[in-house]
């Protein structure tokens, strides 16, 4: 099991949909989140992409030298950048990070943003471009001098002279819910990602990708993207979920859902269908809450509950074949600690052992000393 955290390069705060309790995106704050995730033992962090975010490659480049073990899941955008240039960027960052780069392949689901970035392709064409892009990208990073002519992309003598540390190339992660996305995942990527739908729906998606990959003689690993709201009691967790959206007006929800409706992303459509823009009845499966998606695009569901409930839901997804869990919580600095402290002890190794760092001992007490000479009591 690999547990990731998330870098909030599009903003952070205590609530959704309001400036109340909000935090600006600064390098110092992102450094705090990244270093906390590194110190706590998270496998890596996802850096989002899009016009509402700071650039993921610049952010990763700034944070890599400030962390020791943390991996960075960074987006590439087929159709926006040359596959050869992208491959060389990946090789460089992989070398500079000591092999800590992971690649998130993003086709882009917002036609308005895509046109602003210079891409006027429709949904099916974007997947055609992504397929051609990855064929070039993968070969370049394996040391080939590539000649390629496809429907959309053409290169001659494309090459990267400096190889990545990870061989044959940094692992490719990719998410999508359409048939075209499942075909692409089965054919070219290492880890297929899904947003946090109910377990039965996730099981269907994984089975479909698994079957398509088997027909091509391949195996694909699986991951899931979820928010998390965990507290010591279930009542506290659900209260925190309610508090997170208490400042969102109905007009704001309507405006957000109208914006999402222009997307041609099947995944976004499925996320929106979980709540239909309504704030009532947001628990769509046991401990799975769709409130985040009322105003946030992309991943819109959260695991909500006490540590045992959250761990049980994680195990439920793991039993389906999920190996990588990409979590986030508001605010991201505090919640990185809270999730590690409350849930890591209930997860498989190495996370259970990482949580054991909090055991008090006389040579290195954790927690504030009592009076002037008494260590805190172990729990």
UniProtKB/Swiss-Prot annotation:
The keyword Metal-binding does not apply. It is an enzyme of class 1 (oxidoreductase). One of its GO terms (biological process) is alkanesulfonate catabolic process. It catalyses: an alkanesulfonate + FMNH2 + O2 = an aldehyde + FMN + sulfite + H2O + 2 H(+). Its EC number is 1.14.14.5. Gene3D superfamilies: Luciferase-like domain (3.20.20.30). Pfam families: Bac_luciferase. It comes from the Bacteria. Keywords: Flavoprotein, FMN, Monooxygenase, Oxidoreductase. GO terms for molecular function: alkanesulfonate monooxygenase activity. The keyword Oxidoreductase applies. Catalyzes the desulfonation of aliphatic sulfonates. Belongs to the SsuD family. PANTHER family: ALKANESULFONATE MONOOXYGENASE, ALKANESULFONATE MONOOXYGENASE-RELATED. This is Alkanesulfonate monooxygenase. It comes from Pseudomonas syringae pv. syringae (strain B728a).
């Amino acid at each position: 099991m690999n547990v990731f955290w998330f870098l909030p390069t599009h903003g952070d705060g205590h609530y959704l949909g309001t400036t109340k309790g909000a935090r600006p995106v600064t390098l110092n704050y992102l450094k705090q989140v990244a270093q906390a995730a590194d110190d706590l033992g998270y496998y890596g962090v996802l850096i989002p992409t899009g016009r509402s975010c700071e650039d993921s490659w610049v952010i990763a480049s700034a944070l890599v030298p400030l962390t020791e073990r943390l991996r960075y899941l960074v987006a590439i955008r087929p159709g926006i950048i040359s596959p050869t240039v992208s491959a060389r960027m990946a090789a460089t960052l992989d070398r500079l990070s000591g092999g800590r780069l992971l690649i998130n392949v993003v086709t882009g689901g917002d036609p308005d943003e895509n046109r602003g970035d210079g891409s006027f392709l429709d949904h099916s064409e974007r997947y055609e471009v992504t397929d051609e892009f990855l064929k070039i990208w993968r070969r370049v990073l394996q040391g080939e001098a590539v000649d390629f002519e496809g429907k959309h992309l053409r290169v001659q003598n494309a090459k990267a002279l400096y190889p990545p540390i990870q061989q044959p190339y940094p692992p490719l992660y990719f998410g999508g819910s359409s048939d075209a996305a499942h075909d692409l995942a089965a054919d070219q990527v290492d880890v297929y990602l899904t947003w946090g739908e109910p377990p039965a729906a996730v099981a269907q998606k994984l089975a479909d990708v698994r079957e398509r990959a088997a027909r091509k003689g391949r195996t694909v690993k699986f991951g899931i993207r979820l928010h998390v709201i965990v507290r010591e009691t279930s009542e506290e967790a659900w209260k925190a979920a309610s508090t997170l959206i208490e400042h969102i007006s109905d007009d704001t929800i309507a405006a957000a859902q109208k914006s999402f409706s222009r997307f041609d992303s099947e995944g976004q459509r499925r996320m929106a269908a979980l709540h239909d823009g309504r704030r009532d009845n947001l628990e769509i499966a046991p401990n799975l809450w769709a409130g985040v998606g009322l105003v946030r695009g992309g991943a819109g569901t959260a695991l909500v509950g006490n540590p045992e409930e959250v761990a049980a839901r994680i195990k439920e997804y793991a039993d389906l074949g999920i190996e990588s869990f990409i979590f986030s919580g508001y605010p991201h600095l505090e919640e990185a600690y809270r999730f590690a402290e409350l849930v890591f002890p209930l997860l498989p190794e190495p996370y259970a052992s990482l949580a054991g760092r909090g055991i008090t001992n006389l040579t290195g007490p954790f927690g504030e000393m009592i009076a002037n000479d008494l260590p805190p009591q172990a729990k």
